[in-house]
Amino acid sequence: MFRRLIGVVVATVLLTFQLIVGSATALELDEATRTVPLNAQGDTVTLSLKQVKEGKRLFQYACAQCHVGGVTKTNQNVGLEPEALALATPNRNNIEGLVDYMKNPTTYDGVEEISEIHPSIKSADIFTAMRNLTDKDLESIAGHILLQPKILGDKWGGGKIYY
């Protein structure tokens, strides 16, 4: 009887603590954090809280099976960290560049099209997770990818040493 009472008290304290403290959500991201590059010309855009939330959900749905934590499972040398995106040709460190890649992916040097081996809108018949994604969805996913280094720092794309 006493053990049950202790268990109930501990559970109540933990649940109360969780309600008081809460968890990090999109609501806690300030406008400066949510501002990401829009294009190669240097324009920026501030993501709405809805875009942040939707981008995370869509990334988990369509991309995370291969890019969990910003790492590329099939090629550990190329991830989604800002440096790798900036060095790609054309560079992919902005929303327009990432959306273009999700529509028509190319090799890191930009020479060959790889839509048959990388999920994209172009290959939605093969990679069904991409089938119903709209341009707004792709922009939300791109925003999520560009936002993660600001939230996670070096963990995003850092690989096994962080996870």
Curated annotation (Swiss-Prot):
**GO cellular component terms?**
photosystem II; plasma membrane-derived thylakoid membrane
As to how many cofactors bind and how, the note says: Binds 1 heme c group covalently per subunit.
Q: Which residues cross the membrane?
A: none
Which amino acids does the record list as binding heme c? Answer: C63, C66, H67, H118
Q: How does it sit in the membrane?
A: Peripheral membrane protein
- Mitochondrion: present as a keyword of the record? no
Location comes to: Cellular thylakoid membrane
Principal cellular location given in the protein's record: membrane
InterPro entries given in the database record: Cyt_c-like_dom, Cyt_c-like_dom_sf, Cytochrom_C550, PsbV_cyt_c550, PsbV_cyt_c550-like
Query: What positions belong to coiled-coil segments?
Result: none
Any one Gene Ontology BP term: respiratory electron transport chain
Give start-end of the signal peptide.
1-26
Q: What cofactor does this one take? A: heme c
Extract the Pfam families matched here: Cytochrom_C550
Q: Name one GO molecular function term.
A: iron ion binding
What biological function has been recorded for the protein in this entry?
A: One of the extrinsic, lumenal subunits of photosystem II (PSII). PSII is a light-driven water plastoquinone oxidoreductase, using light energy to abstract electrons from H(2)O, generating a proton gradient subsequently used for ATP formation. The extrinsic proteins stabilize the structure of photosystem II oxygen-evolving complex (OEC), the ion environment of oxygen evolution and protect the OEC against heat-induced inactivation. Low-potential cytochrome c that plays a role in the OEC of PSII.
Q: Which HAMAP family match?
A: PSII_Cyt550
Q: Which family does it belong to?
A: Belongs to the cytochrome c family. PsbV subfamily.
Known partners and oligomeric status: PSII is composed of 1 copy each of membrane proteins PsbA, PsbB, PsbC, PsbD, PsbE, PsbF, PsbH, PsbI, PsbJ, PsbK, PsbL, PsbM, PsbT, PsbX, PsbY, PsbZ, Psb30/Ycf12, peripheral proteins PsbO, CyanoQ (PsbQ), PsbU, PsbV and a large number of cofactors. It forms dimeric complexes.
Per its record, how is this protein called by name?
Photosystem II extrinsic protein V
Which organism's genome codes for this protein?
A: Trichormus variabilis (strain ATCC 29413 / PCC 7937) (Anabaena variabilis)
